[in-house]
Design a protein with these regions (language model features):
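Short solvent-exposed coil/turn linkers within tandem alpha-helical repeat scaffolds
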Residues: 440-443, 474-480, 509-518, 535, ...
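Single-residue signature of alpha-solenoid repeat helices
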Residues: 430-431, 464, 501, 538
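Bacterial N-terminal signal peptides
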Residues: 6-16
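Alpha-solenoid helical repeat scaffolds
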Residues: 435-436, 469, 506, 523, ...
Length: 555
């Protein structure tokens, strides 16, 4: 066991555990809308939870809509915030000499030469988007591609360049992020021209407040659960980078020990897919939350990151059903990102970089989000606690703390340990022996399911079925229970255990009468009923199939 634990420590400890501020809240300014009472309430709540000094909380009179004009952004938010930071001596702007390069002459840049803060948090009620000005024109914009000759932007993304306010940057199109891909989080600060801006936002003030609560819970207990990735299996060179990013993110999660599911089908995850205990979800490409995410309950774990790549995924944050960001937050995600308007693929976050920085490098959410963006002053909004750092504790420390509290989350730590060793090529027999000898396996649906999976991979179907049945008795989550029943049905069929398969699928429909893919289960039951010569049951299932089947297309 100690040998296996050492692999876990090496695999996940990373370069993450770097020095941090004694009180991270000192590095945050909190911004709210004085015209929205709930905005100040969210700001005060966050400041209390993260110990943000009261003189770093700023209120401005802003639009009460999600959109604001460019003029309002400049005069009511951008300039007043910059002035407030200067007045409170939170940063000091001065001249910085930028040496010449082979491609660019030397120049003087005005930006902060000292800064006490690195993050800005925009609270529920602060507008989301700077509106497009149809009459906008700017010198030099004719050099941009036609589709980039626009001045609308996410408020977050525009404010990220607040340290360069004296530079009078162009407004048309995106600005290159010179810190894209950085591996040293210390570079991500105003003295290098960037402010890490996120939002505590969502469909309701309560959802917004809950984001910091879940972040703090995950920092204390760890981010545990499963990782799901939804590819399109696309070959078009214009869109393939999206798949490449997501695939690379999935490989990172697999290597650090997440139970990882990768869907290669062009469509999104179907509604009936049993998506249990979600720690990470990254996918594309649908306009509105769909499939498992449109169900009444989604099993997001505390601290979960969920992101769906779509051009308008954050067109509004107020809806629980439209687009993606609002619904994901409403269903329990802790951190997410999205686009307020068409960004084009290269203008969206590189989720491979994001995942690597969050996990391998131990960045905070705010740091990882901005290290992953190739451009700023563009369309990405970043929603969640910027200080959230899910991989800030070493794995061995987390394991000790969870075990000392007799927390069931320790089961996930053991699961990650097994998965890391499996990826490293350890023999299945060794992993099976570890789980068989582990006392926690006897009481854990999570570990018993893994043990059953290993038996199946080892070619021991009877042992696998027995252990899947054991897992069903150990209080699995609803979605895990569905997955176990579906898996058992397949295993029974493979072993010609027709009666067992029949009873298994009946149990699924009995326990989950609203299962989204009820039609598929009824078809299986019809076939099994016919095979077992259960004529009345077969007639009933045929009637149910007729009722559930979509009508044929009109001629």
């Amino acid at each position: 066991m100690n040998r296996l634990l050492s692999v876990l420590v090496v695999a996940v400890s990373s370069a993450a555990l770097t020095a941090r501020a004694a009180n991270p809240g000192d590095e945050v300014v909190v911004v709210y809308n004085t015209r929205v009472p709930e905005s100040k309430a969210v700001a005060d709540y966050y400041a209390a939870r993260r110990l943000v000094p009261t003189d770093q909380i700023f209120g401005f009179a802003l639009s009460t809509n999600e959109d604001m004009s460019r003029m309002e952004f400049r005069d009511a938010l951008q300039k007043p915030l910059a002035q407030a930071l200067k007045k409170r001596k939170l940063w000091q702007i001065g001249q910085t000499i930028i040496p010449a390069t082979t491609n660019r002459p030397g120049r003087v840049e005005w930006k902060p030469v000292k800064s006490k803060i690195r993050y800005a948090l925009l609270c529920y009620g602060v507008p989301l988007r700077i509106e497009k000005d149809p009459n906008f024109t700017e010198l030099g914009m004719e050099n941009l591609r036609p589709e980039l000759r626009r001045d609308e932007a996410a408020v977050d993304s525009e404010l990220a360049l607040l340290p360069l306010i004296e530079e009078k940057l162009p407004l048309a199109g995106p600005m290159r992020n010179a810190l894209y891909g950085v591996t040293n989080s210390a570079w991500l600060q105003p003295t290098n021209g960037i402010l890490l801006v996120t939002r505590l936002d969502g469909p309701t003030p309560g959802i917004a407040r809950g984001l910091v609560d879940k972040a703090l819970q995950a920092e204390a207990d760890g981010l545990w659960g499963r990782a799901y990735f939804d590819l399109r299996n696309i070959t078009d060179p214009a869109y393939k980078p999206g798949d490449d990013w997501i695939r690379a993110a999935s490989e990172i999660c697999r290597r650090v020990g997440f139970e990882t599911v990768v869907d290669e089908n062009p469509g999104t995850f179907p509604a009936g897919f049993p998506m249990s205990q979600i720690a990470i979800y990254i996918g594309w490409y649908d306009g509105n939350a769909c499939g498992p995410f449109a169900q009444p309950t989604v099993e997001f774990m505390p601290g979960a990151f969920a992101y769906h790549l779509h051009s308008f995924s954050a067109a509004t944050l107020r809806s629980t059903t439209q687009y993606w960001v609002g619904p994901l937050l409403a269903k329990g995600a802790t951190i997410t990102m999205g686009c307020v308007a068409e960004p084009y693929l290269a203008g969206t976050p590189d989720v491979a970089v994001f995942t690597a920085r969050l996990i391998f490098n131990g960045f905070t959410f705010g740091e990882a989000a901005y290290a992953a963006q190739q451009v700023l002053s563009w369309q990405t909004t970043v929603v969640g606690d910027p200080l959230y750092r899910p991989f800030g504790k070493s794995p061995d420390r987390l394991q000790r703390e969870l075990a000392a509290r007799d927390s069931k989350l320790a089961d996930w730590s053991y699961l990650r340990l097994v998965d890391i060793n499996q990826v490293a090529g350890k023999p299945l027999a060794e992993l099976i022996a570890f789980l068989e000898q582990l006392e926690a396996t006897k009481r854990s649906a999570v570990l018993s399911e893994k043990l059953a999976d290993l038996y199946a991979a080892q070619g021991k179907p009877s042992s696998a079925v027995y252990t899947y049945l054991q897992a069903l008795q150990l209080d699995p989550s609803p979605q895990q229970r569905i997955r176990l029943l579906l898996t058992l049905g397949e295993k029974f069929l493979a072993q010609d255990r027709t009666q067992d398969a029949y009873e298994d699928y009946q149990k699924l429909l009995h326990e989950f009468p609203d299962y989204p893919d009820k039609l598929a289960i009824c078809r299986k039951l019809l076939s099994l009923a016919q095979k077992l010569d259960k004529k009345t049951d077969a007639e009933n299932y045929q009637a149910e199939i007729n009722r559930l089947s979509p009508p044929p297309p009109k001629p």
